[in-house]
Amino acid sequence: MIVAGVDEAGRGPLFGPVVAAAVILNEEIDGLDDSKKLTSRKREKLFLEIIKKSYFAISIATADEIDKFNILHATEIAMDRALERLRKKINFDIAFVDGKNLNLKFPFKCIVKGDSLVKEISAASILAKVVRDRIIVSYAKKFSSYMLEKHKGYPTQLHLKLIKEHGLTPLHRLTYKPVMELLSITQLEEWYKSGMIDEERYKKIISKMEVPLFGIQDTR
């Protein structure tokens, strides 16, 4: 039986995408574990070994999709995308997925703490974590005020302090409570009118803020 391991990185941050990876190992790799238990240096070393010794695919769901569909469904979307890409390279019988209460389009089994128990999931967790960190660091120059390279978008005291000082961006997850508490209607309207966020996302955020829609007829 060919098993693909699937995991995500980035459900908790306030900024940027959630990243999912799917992995089928071709060779044994020593030192695989939940990416959160490994140092950055160890993750990077294992990352290079995994991509040499496996079939893999990586995908994301954006902050826009997280706001529209919620983080659980956005995670499922990212995982399905990764599995779809992987299946184009090699067929598999089942996907073992870290976590619980997920619903994917492919045959799958959820395994609680799977990133520590199943080597394929451990490998996927490492790929997802390394790629997500690289994505966030790539934004650091454009959004230098937020010091993304230090906290990777997570809700640290530093990140929240910098949001209060410099405001938000459309790449922040605007439906997350710590972010929404700092989001002004004026800013949201400016992004919508300038095309930086679309109508669907605008409506979703407004509905969670429990304020009237500005200039938009709700057709639901």
UniProtKB/Swiss-Prot annotation:
Which Pfam families does the UniProt record give?
A: RNase_HII
Localisation: Cytoplasm
The cofactor note from the UniProt entry for this protein is: Manganese or magnesium. Binds 1 divalent metal ion per monomer in the absence of substrate. May bind a second metal ion after substrate binding.
Can you list the GO cellular component terms from the UniProt entry? cytoplasm; ribonuclease H2 complex
Choose any GO biological process term that the UniProt entry carries and state it: mismatch repair
**GO MF term (any one):** manganese ion binding
> InterPro entries from the entry?
RNase_HII (IPR022898), RNase_HII/HIII (IPR001352), RNase_HII/HIII_dom (IPR024567), RNaseH-like_sf (IPR012337), RNaseH_sf (IPR036397)
Catalytic activity, reaction form: Endonucleolytic cleavage to 5'-phosphomonoester
Where, by residue number, does a divalent metal cation bind?
Answer: 7-8, 98
Limits of the RNase H type-2 domain: 1-191
Annotated membrane-spanning segments are none
Query: Which keywords belong to this entry?
Result: Cytoplasm, Endonuclease, Hydrolase, Manganese, Metal-binding, Nuclease
Looking up HAMAP family in the UniProt record yields: RNase_HII_B
Job of this protein: Endonuclease that specifically degrades the RNA of RNA-DNA hybrids.
Similarity remark: Belongs to the RNase HII family.
Q: What is this protein called?
A: Ribonuclease HII
**What organism does this protein naturally occur in?**
Thermosipho africanus (strain TCF52B)
Q: What gene name is given for the protein in this entry?
A: rnhB
